[in-house]
From Swiss-Prot:
Family from the record: Belongs to the universal ribosomal protein uS2 family.
Segments crossing the lipid bilayer: none
Broad class of the protein's primary localization: cytoplasm
Protein name in the entry: Small ribosomal subunit protein uS2
InterPro entries recorded: Ribosomal_uS2, Ribosomal_uS2_CS, Ribosomal_uS2_euk, Ribosomal_uS2_euk/arc, Ribosomal_uS2_flav_dom_sf
Function: Required for the assembly and/or stability of the 40S ribosomal subunit. Required for the processing of the 20S rRNA-precursor to mature 18S rRNA in a late step of the maturation of 40S ribosomal subunits.
Subunit details: Component of the small ribosomal subunit. Mature ribosomes consist of a small (40S) and a large (60S) subunit. The 40S subunit contains about 33 different proteins and 1 molecule of RNA (18S). The 60S subunit contains about 49 different proteins and 3 molecules of RNA (25S, 5.8S and 5S). Interacts with ribosomal protein S21.
KW Nucleus (keyword) present: no
PANTHER family xrefs: 40S RIBOSOMAL PROTEIN SA
This protein's UniProt keywords: Cytoplasm, Ribonucleoprotein, Ribosomal protein
Pfam families from the UniProt entry: Ribosomal_S2
Gene Ontology, cellular component aspect: cytosolic small ribosomal subunit
Length: 263
């Protein structure tokens, strides 16, 4: 009989956060983020309290579920590492995803074609997504943000303290948030593990795929080279000037001319 202790959902989630380095902050510290910092390492990097990260994650999931129409939730990531994560989050929760550059005026300028009126905004980084956070303040739209130790909390309603610069950390945070949303909606029971892996939310560099394909092409074995003088032997020049008698090997029937009276 195994003596292995069964982990609670909180312990399991925090263990995954440690693996993906969610707790690793930056050397800079925003004054309003002090409450989420556990300690400071010898190298000056601030360590985030993952217990508070888990609590804020649960709170954010409940706010997302409270929005009746999932399409009224907009997930934004100007950071490349979060582009795939927000697209996958939107796919599984029904939200809208905006990966890449934010068009100015999407929340405030009704004339532009991309104008939207969401009820909730989720951003990957309040610093890189500052334009969308600022517009949400004008439009009175609540904001949920993944905040690092140096992230500004201005106009942010719910801050989820985490490492928002690592691709593994961003992927795991959106995966955990999507999983909790599906649990609260009843799409999957809590007794059942979500069959979607975190790798699906992980950003992949297209250049790495191209380099990998080139390496595979170079490693592919080619046809063996022809042996020396195989199929490539030059014909002797004497044969071209040699005069042969075509009747030497011919049958007697073909040598004799046809009689005229046979026609």
């Amino acid at each position: 009989m195994s003596n292995k202790k069964v982990q609670s959902p909180k312990e399991e989630s925090i263990a995954k956060m440690l693996i993906c380095k969610v707790h690793i902050g930056t050397k800079n510290l925003e004054n309003k983020m002090k409450r989420y910092v556990y300690t400071r390492a010898k190298d000056g990097v601030h360590i985030i309290n993952l217990a508070k990260t888990y609590e804020k994650l649960q709170l954010a999931a409940r706010v997302i579920v409270a929005v009746s129409n999932p399409a009224d939730v907009v997930v934004v990531s100007a950071r490349p590492f979060g582009s795939r994560a927000v697209l996958k989050f939107a796919q599984y929760t029904g939200a809208q995803a905006i990966a890449g550059r934010w068009t100015p005026g999407m929340l405030t300028n009704q004339i532009i074609q991309k104008f939207i009126e969401p009820r909730l905004l989720i951003v990957t980084d309040p610093r890189t997504d500052a334009q969308s956070v600022k517009e949400s303040a004008y439009a009175n739209i609540p904001v949920i943000a993944l905040c690092d130790s140096d992230s500004p909390l201005e106009h942010v309603d719910i801050a989820i303290p985490c490492n928002n610069k690592g691709k593994e950390s961003i992927a795991l945070m959106y995966w955990l948030l999507a999983q909790e949303v599906l649990y609260l909606k009843g799409s999957i029971p809590r007794s059942q593990a979500w069959d979607v892996m975190v790798d699906m939310f992980l950003w992949r560099d297209p250049e790495q795929f191209e380099l990998k394909n080139l390496a595979n092409e170079e490693a592919t074995p080619t046809a063996p080279h022809l042996a020396d003088n195989q199929y490539a032997t030059d014909a002797p020049y004497d044969d071209w000037n040699k005069k042969d008698d075509w009747n030497d090997n011919a049958n007697e029937e073909w040598k004799n001319p046809i009689a005229v009276d046979e026609w």
